[in-house]
């Protein structure tokens, strides 16, 4: 018997942000991690210009052995230990061909679509795909890795700036008969600009932009412009983009 589909209400929080930058999203339990990656990009306001990975926390993680031969995209699932002592799985997709670039997604922040998209960088080779071991995120569902309320996983975006997000399941409910998922339910604060140096670089940028006497004020204004509002979040705009995404 097929498992009954549920709706997961998840909170996505950008780690290190104060006050928290977060989104609450309702998704189907059968959404794959590959699809969830795209939903996170849209809901947060990223542009999918860099690589990503999911870290699935586990008390007793065991690596999965799986070959992915003759592919231009390698996938890897391995056990890692984070600096704070946490251990978990990593499921990630890694292009091994430097001609492959991540596919941009439409952003909820209009200025991203006209500027940051032009700065999509090409990836570097990651090695022989026949030697990689792992599991494709496109074959793993959220319901499989987060089976209950309070289940968590880490989503890391951009291995240079290291934007780490915590995804927590807050509710598991029955789908509404006319419900359309995914849908963003709420959120706070704007997404940081791409390539600004991570969470610490972002707050340094805000300090510089807000202080005309700051040594980098002029430089930051020229880079970010005078229209960036760190408090802005447009729920309707996010859901309009998610509606397009649902249609493929």
Question: Locations of the language-model features?
Answer:
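Short linear regulatory motifs enriched in tryptophan with gly/pro/ser
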Residues: 1-248
């Amino acid at each position: 018997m097929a498992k009954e589909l549920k709706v997961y209400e998840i909170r996505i929080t950008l780690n290190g942000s104060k006050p928290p930058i977060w989104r609450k999203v309702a998704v189907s339990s059968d959404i794959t991690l590959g699809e969830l990656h795209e939903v996170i990009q849209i809901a947060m306001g990223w542009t999918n210009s860099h690589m990503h990975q999911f870290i699935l926390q586990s008390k007793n993680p065991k690596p999965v052995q799986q070959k992915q031969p003759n592919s231009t995209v390698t996938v890897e699932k391995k056990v890692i230990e984070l600096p704070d002592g946490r251990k978990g799985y990593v499921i990630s997709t890694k292009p091994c061909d430097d001609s492959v670039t991540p596919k941009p997604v439409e952003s909820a922040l209009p200025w991203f679509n006209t500027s940051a998209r032009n700065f999509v960088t090409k990836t570097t080779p990651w090695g022989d795909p026949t030697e990689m071991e792992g599991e494709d995120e496109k074959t793993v569902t959220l319901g499989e890795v987060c089976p209950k309320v309070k289940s968590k996983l880490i989503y890391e975006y951009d291995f240079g700036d290291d934007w780490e997000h915590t995804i927590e399941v807050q509710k598991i409910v029955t789908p509404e008969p006319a419900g359309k998922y995914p849908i963003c339910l709420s959120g706070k604060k704007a997404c940081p600009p791409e390539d600004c140096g991570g969470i610490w670089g972002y707050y340094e940028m805000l300090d510089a932009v807000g202080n005309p006497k700051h040594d980098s004020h002029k430089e930051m204004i020229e880079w970010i412009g005078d229209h960036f509002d760190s408090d802005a979040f447009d729920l309707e705009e996010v859901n309009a983009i998610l509606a397009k995404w649902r249609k493929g």
